[in-house]
Amino acid sequence: MYALEIYTVIAMLLITLVAMFMNELTVIQQFAVWVSFLCILHEWEEGRYPGGFLDLIQKNVLQRDLDEETKKGSRLVTAVFIYVMTIVPFFFGDQIPMFVVAPATFCIFEGIIHVVGIKFLGTKKPYTPGLVTAEIELVSGVGIIVWMAVNHVGAWYDYTFGPFVFIACFVCMQRTLMAMVGGIGYKDVLANVRRRFAAK
């Protein structure tokens, strides 16, 4: 399976179509397109250049061997999650601002988790595969939320429930990934995480 390549082609096609046929984009639509592009770079940094992020997760979190087919398939699940996080706000974000807060929260989460991963995953250098693009995502996520707040876009409930939209989508993605791995549940993962932190 060429999940990463398929995701890249589809995402770039969408970005190209937007550039060709939509003359004026709102700030929120520009943000959605920008995040889509960032996610392409992030997936390649995690998976190929330099790559190795899945191997670190496999070793330190799952603590079990995964075949290459499962690894590649997991990226397809991740790609679907990213499509939801970028396409939905592109079309509906101006009407329902919480759909913008959700991917912004996702961007912030990515930036934080990759920094935490430096210590948790025990990397030899202060770097985890995907760190550079993740920090750009973090800045972008904070930036759009600040812009929305300053320009009074959305109500309090958009900022309150937007992160929960992200969490709901993220949990669905994780449950799908756990089902693909098979034989491992959240309790096992949490136990592995606790043991890993206890060993630090």
Regions found by a protein language model. Give the residues of each.
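Loop-to-helix transition at the N-terminal end of transmembrane alpha-helices
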Residues: T26-E43
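Core segments of transmembrane alpha-helices
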Residues: Y7-L14, K72-F90, T133-V142
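Small-residue-rich transmembrane alpha-helices that serve as helix-helix interface/gating elements
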Residues: W156-R175
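Short, highly charged, low-complexity non-transmembrane loops/tails of multi-pass membrane proteins
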Residues: V181-K200
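Membrane-proximal helix-loop-helix units in multi-pass membrane proteins
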Residues: Y83-I136
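Short, hydrophobic transmembrane alpha-helix segments
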Residues: T16-Q29
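Hydrophobic alpha-helical transmembrane segments in multi-pass integral membrane proteins
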Residues: I136-W156
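Juxtamembrane helix-capping/reentrant segments at transmembrane boundaries
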Residues: L56-V77
